[in-house]
């Protein structure tokens, strides 16, 4: 049995990414919101176009998965984050609004049941997310978690309940997530990590049990291009530890996560070689 279960948040635990609703909540409070909303939509469209792989040429100049995601962070993710801060997209939010948005966020079916079952078995539960608001995540799943590691919207001493638009960054890259997974494995032992995107991929590859949930095309294309062992497991299908040990496990839903953790004999010594990254 695993000792720790670590999950990404947006798109893994949640039905939809919470970033857009978060920004729209802040922009909606402005007296003149149209221009700021258009700025946000423009940035969102640019990010989406930059994070969609059309063919293998998207990866061809990189020698490894690790070098690809490092470049993706520098050229796509960080410029977008800098725009979010410089344009003050997240200014003017109250802490209570962040909690409430988290409470209203729709979670994927069976997420809560799976987390509750794991807690009952004394498995440590962590959320590891590049989301901009830990307070939002607390509102959504705080009651199920031992630790949430994410970013924080900043407040000032003069107004400690209203966001400034600045962000205290802790987790912005795949490498940051990998570092935390290594800490969890070293501290607690056998660890499962579940994520849905390219930002999760190094942690997925390194965890004792690495699960890619959903159909994110960039993540799947990257795994194929860099020849990372990968196997899709469906409800009722067979999992063979001797064959599949070291492979990224592809699952479509939390019902499959529940079935996989509950019924499949899991490997006792899954430690993918770093040379595969």
Question: PLM features: what roles do these ranges have?
Answer:
Residues 3, 26-27, 141:
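A broad structural signal for alpha-helix termini and local helix breaks/kinks
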Residues 18-19, 27-124:
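A metal-dependent, Asp-based hydrolase signature
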Residues 15-18, 77, 177, 253:
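Alpha-helical structural motif
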Residues 24-31, 212, 224:
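Residue-level signature of transmembrane alpha-helix interfaces in integral membrane proteins
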Residues 20-23, 208:
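Short secondary-structure boundary/capping segments
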Residues 102-277:
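C-terminal cap/substrate-recognition subdomain and adjoining C-terminal extension
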Residues 2-19, 204:
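Asp-based phosphoryl-transfer active-site loop
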Residues 1-5, 36-42, 272-277:
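N-terminal intrinsically disordered, low-complexity tails enriched in polar/charged
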């Amino acid at each position: 049995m695993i000792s720790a279960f670590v999950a990404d948040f947006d798109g893994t635990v949640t039905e939809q990414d919470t970033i857009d609703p978060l920004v729209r909540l802040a922009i909606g409070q402005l007296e003149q919101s149209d221009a700021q909303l258009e700025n946000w939509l423009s940035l969102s469209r640019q990010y989406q176009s930059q994070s969609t792989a059309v063919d293998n040429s998207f990866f061809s100049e990189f020698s490894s998965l690790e070098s690809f995601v490092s470049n993706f962070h520098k050229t796509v993710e960080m410029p977008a984050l800098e725009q979010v801060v410089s344009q003050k997209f997240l200014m003017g939010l109250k802490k209570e609004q962040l909690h409430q948005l988290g409470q209203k966020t729709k979670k994927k079916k069976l997420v809560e049941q799976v987390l509750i079952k794991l807690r009952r078995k004394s498995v440590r539960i962590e959320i590891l997310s590049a989301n901009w608001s830990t307070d939002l995540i607390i509102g959504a799943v705080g009651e199920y978690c031992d630790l949430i590691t994410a970013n924080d919207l900043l407040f000032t001493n003069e107004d400690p309940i209203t966001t400034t638009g600045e962000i205290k960054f802790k987790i912005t890259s795949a490498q940051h997530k990998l570092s935390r997974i290594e800490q969890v494995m070293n501290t607690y032992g056998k660890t499962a990590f579940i994520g849905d995107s390219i930002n999760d991929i190094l942690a997925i590859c390194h965890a004792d049990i690495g699960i890619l949930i959903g159909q994110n095309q960039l993540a799947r294309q990257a795994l194929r291009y860099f020849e990372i062992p990968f196997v899709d497991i469906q409800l009722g299908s067979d999992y063979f530890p001797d064959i599949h040990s070291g492979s990224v496990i592809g699952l479509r839903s939390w019902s499959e996560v529940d079935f996989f953790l509950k019924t499949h004999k899991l490997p006792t010594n899954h430690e993918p070689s770093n040379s595969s990254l």
